[in-house]
Regions:
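Glycine/tryptophan-enriched, flexible segments
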Residues: 1-149, 255-256, 260-288
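Active-site-proximal binding-pocket segments
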Residues: 84-275
Length: 288
């Protein structure tokens, strides 16, 4: 179709004349220029990924060279996905890579042992373009629900529960681990992002726009065209999409079976074993 045809066209590279001089910024009042937080290998639990085109290509190459194997299997797991997902979204959002560059690398990637993983990844490249184009024609979704009937919906969420959600201290282990993780690193896999929105809107009963800006500030890969549409879909205010209510305990048992992710980000309960670490309130007082 047209998307594949356009993405398959040659990558246009700028022609830089020899007369172009390198320019540097003057850091007034500073002995040393500020540095970007030190990056880490894909899958690490350190600070934010480093910016820049060179880092973008390092992630691009390492993904198709081997990390892609396991992409489909691990995409829903908060810990394993940190390595087997591409981690290219920040570089696309900030313009360090173009979608066409990624698409060309995808088409040239070796298929051996990764056919299904590559197919799953390729489908998501197209969805990225779909949501951005949709936002261009319906940009009001930044401010109001797609289905305006939800403007009249009442909510019972309290300021205290909203604050607890934003700070990662709701008392629900996987929810708190996910929020603390995204605050500290700027990254979280899709399913866990969806669960955070679901928990805010369905379990705590807050309107979708109570948390949309908070997560936008947290995401290193914030992309308006994707963020607002996905937030509304998970909050079930589009009126056309299936309503999905994520059970955070079930998600923890299925996606973080040994509790390693929760144990890392919620050290207060790191001493607990699985499966109790995902529902500590069920532990009898004598065993706590």
């Amino acid at each position: 179709d047209r998307w594949h045809r356009v993405m398959g066209e040659a990558v246009v590279l700028p022609t830089l004349g020899a007369q172009l001089k390198r320019r540097t910024l003057e850091w007034e009042g500073l002995e040393e220029p500020p540095t970007v937080g030190h990056g880490n290998d894909p899958g690490g639990e350190g600070p934010f990924q480093q910016g820049g085109e060179a880092e973008a290509h390092r992630y691009l190459q390492s993904f198709f060279a081997g990390r892609v194997k396991g992409y489909r299997r691990n995409i829903g797991q908060p810990l394993a996905s940190r390595r087997t997902c591409s981690r290219l979204s920040p570089y696309l959002a900030w313009g360090c890579l173009s979608m066409r560059q990624v698409f060309h690398a995808f088409r040239q990637a070796p298929k051996q042992g990764a056919t299904h993983d590559l197919r799953a990844f390729g489908s998501r490249l197209r969805w990225q373009g779909h949501f951005i184009q949709k936002f261009e024609s319906e940009d009001r979704m930044e401010f109001e629900p797609v289905n305006r009937a939800y403007l009249e919906q009442g909510h019972t969420g309290t300021p205290e529960s909203l604050r607890a959600w934003k700070e990662g201290r709701t008392g629900v282990p996987l929810v708190d681990a996910c929020m603390r993780c995204v605050i500290a690193t700027g990254y979280l896999n899709f399913r866990m992002r969806a669960m955070l929105v679901s928990f805010l809107t369905h379990h705590l009963d807050h309107p979708w726009d109570a948390g949309v800006e908070h997560l936008a500030r947290c995401f290193l890969d914030f992309e308006p065209g994707i963020h607002y549409a996905q937030f509304q879909m998970q909050a079930a205010v589009t009126g056309i999409n299936t309503i999905r209510i994520y059970n955070p305990v079930k998600q923890g048992l299925e996606r973080d079976a040994e509790g390693a992710f929760v144990r890392h980000w919620v050290p207060e309960i790191a001493h607990l074993q699985a499966p109790e670490i995902h529902h500590p309130w069920t532990i009898p007082p004598m065993q706590r």
